[in-house]
Amino acid sequence: MQQVPYGSVDRDKPLIRVPFTRLAVITVCLPLLGLVACIVLAMLYHYNDATYTHCQVPNYLPSISAAISLTPERYIWRFSIGLHSAPRFLVAAAYLSFYRGRFSRRLTEQLLSGFTFLLALSENVGLLLLTYVSSTETYSVHKSGFILFIGSSLFHMLCTCKLWSLIVKYSISSEEMMSYWFKLRLFLFNGGCCVLAVYFYRRHNTYCEEGITHASRCVSIWWCCPTWPST
C-alpha cells in the first residue's frame, strides 16, 4: 500500500464519487421494491392472514402493516429499509449544508432549514420504528411510529417546498425550477393520498363495509410509503 504524507493534498481527495441523482434513485427504489415484494408474497402465500379485518368482512388487498408483519415479508421489508435509511440520513445532512450555503445571511431561512433537517430525522426514526416493531408485536409502538413517519414526512415536504420556492425566486437555473415543481407535485399527490387513506380508514372502522372501502384505504396508504425522492 502506498504511504501518503500526512500533509499531502492527496489525503484530502475523495476515494469514491457517487452521483447524487443515482444515490437518490437507489434510495427511493429500495423501499418501493421491498413493498412490492412484501405485498406480492402476502397475497400469494398469506392471503387470509394479510387481508383479515377486525370486523371480519371480506377484503381484497393487504395494508402495509399487515403485509410487513408476516414471515418472510417482515425480513425483506426490514432489510430494504435498513439499506434505505442510511442514505436518507446522509441526504438530510447534505440538504442542510446546501440550505446553509444558499441562505447564509438570512436568519429565518436558516432556522427553517434547521427545522426541516429535524423533520427529516424524525421521519427516518418513525420509519425505522414502524419497520422494526411490527403491528403483531407491539401495536401501540408500531402505530406511533407510523403516525410519526407520516406526520414528519408531510411537514418535511411542506418545509422543503417552501425553501425551494425561495431558492427559485432568485434563481434562473432551469434545473432548480424543475426540481421545485417536481417536489411540489409530489407533495400535493402524497398529501392527497394521505387524506384519502384517513377518510377510508375512518369509514371502514365506522361502517365496516365489505371489500372496496378497505381496499381503497390500502391503495392510498401504499402511496404514502417512503418514496419522497431527493430531486
UniProtKB/Swiss-Prot annotation:
InterPro entries associated with the record: Frag1/DRAM/Sfk1 (IPR019402), PGAP2 (IPR039545)
Highest taxon above the source species: Eukaryota
Principal location class: Golgi
Keyword entries, A-Z: Golgi apparatus, GPI-anchor biosynthesis, Membrane, Transferase, Transmembrane, Transmembrane helix
Assigned EC number: 2.3.-.-
Membrane topology: Multi-pass membrane protein
Subcellular location: Golgi apparatus membrane
Transmembrane segments: 23-43, 79-99, 111-131, 147-167, 180-200
Keyword Transmembrane: yes
Gene Ontology BP terms: GPI anchor biosynthetic process
Pfam family, one: Frag1
One GO CC term on file: endoplasmic reticulum membrane
Membrane topology (Cytoplasmic): 1-22, 100-110, 168-179
Keyword Ribonucleoprotein attached: no
Lumenal side: 44-78, 132-146, 201-231
Family membership: Belongs to the PGAP2 family.
Cited function: Involved in the fatty acid remodeling steps of GPI-anchor maturation where the unsaturated acyl chain at sn-2 of inositol phosphate is replaced by a saturated stearoyl chain. May catalyze the second step of the fatty acid remodeling, by reacylating a lyso-GPI intermediate at sn-2 of inositol phosphate by a saturated chain. The fatty acid remodeling steps is critical for the integration of GPI-APs into lipid rafts.
Protein name: Acyltransferase PGAP2
Annotated source species: Danio rerio
